[in-house]
């Protein structure tokens, strides 16, 4: 009894601490990051392919919309990259928070001039620099940048975050600062019932069961009756949320699982730890994502799931039903505007002669043969799985191996070593490990140890050694058949590489380095004409591109 009291108190303390954090945000007088209200097209915590979305996306229709500081402070970091957030600003505030503005088209004039000076000084388009407090002081509401489509962006929008400055963790602002008009409860499409061990059964099978729901307007049940379970059992839910006046799909704030009115699982999206982002593929069922493009949230924790999103969890969200007894299952979803959806259904426990629950061992795993070695630490997987390895033949440099199951997510990278006696001389520094996983191909850098070449992978898949001996291609987009300064403002060049990708590039006019932007998603270098290319004379253009 004493233990139960202590656990209950702990849950209450955690919950209250989260509430205090949200209440503090309400009192800090943050303003809207744009001068005009634009529709929210992505919300905090919604699932992306391999991570949680860490901010709010505002669709600005076109580029160039003014972005303002949400509170007084100073620009603490400037980022310019062909990838990720593209052009981004970080502003530290006295309140203890940092605001982040990503996918910008350009910075405000004073910042833009300083950034260009740094780029020319370093002869590099990319920039990631920290700044002292006195460099760029900003007032609340001051224009600091303009919306764009830079980096890994699919259209003109602002990606906005509020982070704790000390921890750098993004926080939820939708339930406090940036509330939206929304009276639509979440949609619940399916529930999933999991046999959580090899000895557990759902409807007499040791495989998870997905059942579609029926219902609407926040009240749902399942389309299948007579569900029987034995052994350790868990649940999951497939859902999406919607917001008034948009057609986008969003994540929800809270998910709760009740078994006979007893709370077994509670998740809440209030803060995201960047260092734990890949745990998203344990929080959500990775196999459903890669196999069926479904976002199914587990309402139970795998052994390796160490996310801090759970105010209350009992027995990792799992339970063992008694034979012959019916259990009422209720799962509740709450969106960021407190709209509630509920699904109710019943399962019955049944006998299982082999239902003894044995905790899965968590050991280092090592597979060795003459041509392949695989090492996975004890915490490489979220749960214990065997790692099957199959030889699939050979290419010019090495054997080809299928390692593991592509539908199983990895918590930590595994080490893969392939043997080859054919790699030396000129191709040594051009050798990579090719990883094919879920129809996607990546080249991983390798470390040579004798005749073994080792790479580290965050995914299972099919692996082999390859050499990238083909140089990148360069193709002008701008036509040079007539004077271009009189008809165009920019020079554009298409660059691409069929294997390892673009690592470095440089543009020279009359043998002088000039600043060219790189749009990685479209593979385009662009140079805006300036004093380095005066009109009325012929110029020599040189483009240098290096792959990885």
Task: Give the role of each language-model region.
Residues 236-242, 417-421, 490-498:
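Short edge beta-strand/loop segments characteristic of extracellular beta-sandwich folds
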Residues 21-98, 105-110, 125-134, 139-140, ...:
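Surface-exposed, glycine-biased beta-strand/turn segments
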Residues 183-191, 469-473, 539:
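Proline-centered linker/hinge motifs at extracellular inter-domain junctions
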Residues 1-28:
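Bacterial Sec-dependent N-terminal signal peptides
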Residues 353-362, 386-432:
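Proteolytic processing hotspots in large secreted/extracellular or virion-associated proteins
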Residues 229-234, 409-417, 484-492:
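Short coil/turn motif common to extracellular beta-sandwich-like domains
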Residues 406-463, 504-506, 512-515:
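Proteolytic-maturation and junctional protease-sensitive modules
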Residues 109, 139, 181, 196-199, ...:
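Long, low-complexity serine/threonine/glycine- and acidic-rich segments characteristic of extracellular
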């Amino acid at each position: 009894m004493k233990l139960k009291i202590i656990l209950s108190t702990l849950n209450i303390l955690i919950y209250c601490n989260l509430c205090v954090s949200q209440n503090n945000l309400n009192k800090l007088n943050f303003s809207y990051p744009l001068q005009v209200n634009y529709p929210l097209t992505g919300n905090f915590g919604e699932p992306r392919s391999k991570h949680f979305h860490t901010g709010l996306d505002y669709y600005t229709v076109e580029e160039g919309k003014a972005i303002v500081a949400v509170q007084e402070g100073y620009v603490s970091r400037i980022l310019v990259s062909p990838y990720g957030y593209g052009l981004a600003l970080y502003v530290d505030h006295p309140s203890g928070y940092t605001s982040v503005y990503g996918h910008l088209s350009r910075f405000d004039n004073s910042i833009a001039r300083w950034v260009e000076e740094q780029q020319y000084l370093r002869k590099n388009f990319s920039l990631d620099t920290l700044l002292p407090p006195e460099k760029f002081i900003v007032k609340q509401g001051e224009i600091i940048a303009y919306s764009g489509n830079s980096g890994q962006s699919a259209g003109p929008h602002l990606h906005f975050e509020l982070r704790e400055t000390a921890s750098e963790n993004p926080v939820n602002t939708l339930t406090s600062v940036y509330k939206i008009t929304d009276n639509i409860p979440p949609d619940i499409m399916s529930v999933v019932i999991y046999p959580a061990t090899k000895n557990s059964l759902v409807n007499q099978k040791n495989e998870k069961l997905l059942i579609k729901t029926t219902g609407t307007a926040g009240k749902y049940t399942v389309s299948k009756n007579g569900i029987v379970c034995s052994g350790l059992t868990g649940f999951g839910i497939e859902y999406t949320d919607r917001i008034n006046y948009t057609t986008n799909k969003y994540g929800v704030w809270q998910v709760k699982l009740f078994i006979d009115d007893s709370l077994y699982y509670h998740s809440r999206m209030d803060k995201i730890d960047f260092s734990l982002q890949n745990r998203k593929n344990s929080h959500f069922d990775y196999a459903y994502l890669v196999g069926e493009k479904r976002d199914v949230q587990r309402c139970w924790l795998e052994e390796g799931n160490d996310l801090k999103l759970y105010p209350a969890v009992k027995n990792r969200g799992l339970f063992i039903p008694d034979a012959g007894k019916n259990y009422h299952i209720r799962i509740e979803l709450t969106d960021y505007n407190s709209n509630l959806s509920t699904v109710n259904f019943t399962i019955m426990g049944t006998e299982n002669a082999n239902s003894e629950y044995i905790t899965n061992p968590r050991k280092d795993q090592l597979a060795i043969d003459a041509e392949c070695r695989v090492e996975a630490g004890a915490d490489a997987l979220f749960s214990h799985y065997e790692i099957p390895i199959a030889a699939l033949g050979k290419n010019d440099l090495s054997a080809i191996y299928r390692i593991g199951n592509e539908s199983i997510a990895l918590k930590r990278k595994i080490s893969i070593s392939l043997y080859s006696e054919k790699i030396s001389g000129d191709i040594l520094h051009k050798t990579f490990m090719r990883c094919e996983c879920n129809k996607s191909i990546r080249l991983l850098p390798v470390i040579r140890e004798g005749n073994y070449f080792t790479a580290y992978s965050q995914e299972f898949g099919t692996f082999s050694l390859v050499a990238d001996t083909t140089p990148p291609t360069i193709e002008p987009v701008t036509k040079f058949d007539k004077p271009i300064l009189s008809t165009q403002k920019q020079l554009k060049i298409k660059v691409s590489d069929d294997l390892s990708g673009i690592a470095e590039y440089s543009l020279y006019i009359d043998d002088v380095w000039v600043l060219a932007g790189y749009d990685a998603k479209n593979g385009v270098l662009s140079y805006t004409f300036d004093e380095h290319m005066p009109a009325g004379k012929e110029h020599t253009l040189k483009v240098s591109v290096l792959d990885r």
